[in-house]
A protein has these predicted regions:
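Conserved ATP-driven motor cores of ASCE-family P-loop NTPases powering translocation/secretion/packaging/pilus
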Residues: 227-231, 415-519
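P-loop NTPase motor domains
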Residues: 2-4, 36, 154-157, 161-423, ...
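Glycine-centered flexibility motif
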Residues: 148, 187, 212, 270, ...
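Accessory regions of macromolecular translocation/handling assemblies
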Residues: 1-190, 199-206, 268-269, 294-298, ...
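Generic beta-strand/beta-sheet core signal
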Residues: 115-121, 125-127, 164, 192, ...
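Short gly/ser/thr-rich secondary-structure transition/capping motifs
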Residues: 143-148, 340-341, 437
Length: 519
């Protein structure tokens, strides 16, 4: 019953519309009449003031005439008084220009008190406003990266970029723009081109390099060339075989130990080729056990760690098989590099090279090549972090379809510490779930360490919610209008109440309705 009563109360009755209209008419008439009277009395007041100031002596004579007993002087005095009053009334008539000014003031005041007022927190501004804000603090405007019309301050380049949006919304177009601008700057750039979109447009064989073992133009790179110290061995193992969940931590650590033993043994015995690397990574359990025994006998102490996992093989233990199976998930990629020579040094190119280095994916072998391409990028990032301090240096890593790479051990450290090395990361992906699936709780740290965040349209509710939180909240002072109605006109009234409200700058659902190329 209460619900029916409430619905009946909310029904659109005609008298409600009448009350709103009639109240509006009354308030409008009241405004015009009151304003008219204010201006009219102001007109009269100014007229008397001007007469008093400029015809004071004449007023004395007029009043003296009224003190006599000559009626004909009274008539002349009244006529003269009316004459100068009309004259000054006309001269003061411009005061009526205040009438529309008053109306304009009312309008401005109404807009001010009814408009939500931003108190603090995040704020949405137009593209032109943001451009003006940024350019105000820029000393040099030439050669800057731009996002649409918006310039990117030089110091923001090394604070990294995070680009997110569903397929086909404009991420690739934005990266095209970045690469084109960086080409004009002759910057040093490493581009992860999973789909091959960028190499077809920007590859210049005179200055650029390609890494893709299935491309005849590829550089001849061997990971063994990047090893200079014992610490490099473990670092490369971590790059190739990423950390995983606690449930399989043992198998990951064991696989890393075996791979580290292989690397160290190859380096120790001067077998620094991709052919030898693939040969030892593909050994059977029995052959791997025998090889580790040989390595230990030759003084390779690190091989003892691998030997501990393999010794049980002869007794029927499955540990050796499981460890090698885990390792081969990541080392099978070396089959595709076994024909490559050991000619290219990533570290040397980062220190002395120029141009672009394209790391090109091959979708048909996505899962097989993922560890190799991830290893290459992770090693490149670590080498960049080992360079001397040089904030003015710029080395860009543009990683499109970032989620197609496996977990990079150095990416979070690069985001936090890369600024002093001149390192700039551009990470692009389709939704936040992809990032969280790979990096787990570190996904939010990656996002938080990117100062320039660009979001295109998103369909995934989790991604929408995360991006809404990233763009922040604002404290708003809003005005609520309340219209009271009654049978008697005296009961009608409009009240305005101002109160503070906390709201999200961008609602999660708004991301779903962004148009293509709109961010």
């Amino acid at each position: 019953m209460e619900r029916k009563h409430l619905e009946a109360y909310k029904e659109a009755k005609s008298f409600k519309g009448f009350e709103v209209w009639w109240h509006s008419v009354q308030m409008t008439l009241k405004m015009y009449i009151t304003t008219f009277l204010i201006v009219f009395f102001l007109h009269l007041f100014l007229t008397f003031i001007f007469i008093f100031l400029f015809r004071f002596d004449d007023l004395k004579l007029v009043f003296l005439a009224f003190t006599t007993f000559s009626p004909h002087l009274w008539i002349k005095a009244v006529f003269y008084l009316v004459k100068i009053s009309i004259l000054f009334f006309i001269l003061c008539s411009p005061v009526w220009l205040a009438f529309p000014i008053f109306l304009k003031k009312y309008k401005v005041k109404a807009e001010k008190i009814t408009r939500d007022e931003h108190l603090r927190g995040a704020k949405v501004v137009s593209e032109d406003e943001l451009k003006q804000i940024i350019e105000k603090d820029l000393k040099e405007k030439k050669g800057l990266l731009t996002i649409g019309k918006i310039p990117v301050p030089p110091m923001a380049e090394t604070r990294h970029f995070f680009i997110i949006g569903r397929s086909g919304t404009g991420k690739t177009r934005l990266i095209y723009s970045f690469i084109s601008q960086l080409r004009e700057r002759r910057a040093k750039v490493i581009v992860y081109d999973f789909k091959g979109d960028f190499i077809s447009c920007f590859y210049d064989p005179s200055v650029d390099l390609i890494f893709n073992p299935l491309d005849r133009r590829t550089i001849h790179w061997c990971v063994l060339r990047e090893i200079e110290t014992f610490a490099d061995v473990d670092s490369i193992s971590m790059s190739l075989i990423p950390s995983s969940t606690r449930d399989d931590k043992f198998w990951v650590d064991a696989a890393r130990d075996v791979f580290s033993s292989i690397l160290f043994y190859l380096k120790y015995t001067k077998q620094e080729t991709n052919h030898h690397l693939w040969h030892y990574c593909s050994l059977s359990e029995e052959d791997m056990l025998n090889q580790m025994i040989i390595a230990v006998n030759q003084g390779v102490e690190i091989a003892k760690r691998a030997l501990g996992y393999l010794l049980g093989y002869e007794k029927g233990s499955k540990v050796a098989s499981d460890v090698l199976s885990t390792m081969r998930q990541y080392t099978n990629c070396f089959f595709y590099t076994s024909h490559l020579k050991n000619e290219f040094s990533l570290k040397q190119w980062l220190e002395e090279g120029e141009g672009f280095l394209f790391i090109v994916g091959f979708p048909r072998l996505r899962d097989t090549l993922r560890p190799l391409l991830s290893l290459f990028i992770d090693v490149a990032i670590k080498h960049t972090l080992s360079l001397s301090e040089a904030p003015e240096r710029r080395i860009f890593f543009i990683l499109d379809e970032f989620s197609t790479l496996q977990k990079l051990s150095a990416v979070l450290f690069a985001l936090e510490q890369g600024r002093s090395k001149g390192l700039s990361l551009v990470l692009a992906l389709q939704d936040f779930n992809q990032l969280e699936r790979i990096y787990h709780e570190s996904a939010f740290s990656i996002l938080n360490n990117c100062s320039t965040i660009i979001s295109f349209a998103l369909n995934d509710p989790k991604s929408q919610e995360v991006m809404s939180r990233v763009f922040g909240e604002a404290e708003i002072l809003e005005t609520d209008e309340t219209l009271a109605m009654g049978v008697e006109d005296t009961r009608d009234g409009l009240s305005l109440v101002r109160r503070r409200r906390l709201e999200k700058v961008i609602l999660p659902a708004e991301f779903a309705y962004l148009k293509d190329l709109q961010a």
